[in-house]
Amino acid sequence: MILIAFLLSYGFGNESLLSQLYPGRVVMPKPVYDEIDRPALAWMKARVDSMINAGKLTVVELTSGTDEFDLYYKLTVNPDEGHKIIGDGEASSIALAKVKNGIVASNNFNDIFTYINEYSLEYTTTADILVDAYKKGIIDENQGNTVWANMLRKRRKLGAVNFSDYLSTHS
């Protein structure tokens, strides 16, 4: 199971790289879905809704009384001493990943790195997904550079000036 926090991988055409790389394994916690339901993110919500309607993404509710809800509550309202409260999207992704043995997909490690380590969670980033797509022949290096440049224009932090540079050190 791949869990999306604030990471929605760019695709080519109408296909998402996530759904191509991880068919049937892409889920979005309901709190994340709720966070993208605003005018400034209408483009992202439209893409998510398209993936949902095509059966390529499932939105998962956190139900009161479940282990994942209890952890979500702890992370958003009453964290352990020395830990900070994190946002609903990050917390729901971490809670589901911990309970369901999923992978957290996020570029926002400032808030969640402590929890990723503490719970020994597997995680991935946009950069990792692009490398995986490249290795599997879903995208070529030029397409990776295009996605990378688009994300940098949106002020995303990716760890290299372009995909080619990242690829040279991570493949």
Give the positions of each predicted feature.
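Glycine-centered loop/turn motif at secondary-structure junctions
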Residues: N101, Y119-S120, G137
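Long, charge-dense
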Residues: T126-I139
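Active-site-proximal, substrate-binding regions of enzyme catalytic domains
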Residues: M1-L96, K100-G102, F113, N142-N150, ...
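Short beta-strand scaffold positions
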Residues: S106-N107
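Short, electropositive alpha-helical surface patch
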Residues: I116-Y123, A160-N162
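Positions that flank functional sites
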Residues: N110-F113, V131
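Short Asp/Glu-rich motifs
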Residues: R38, Y115-N117, K135
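Short hydrophobic/aromatic-enriched beta-strand-loop microsegments
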Residues: V26, L121-I129
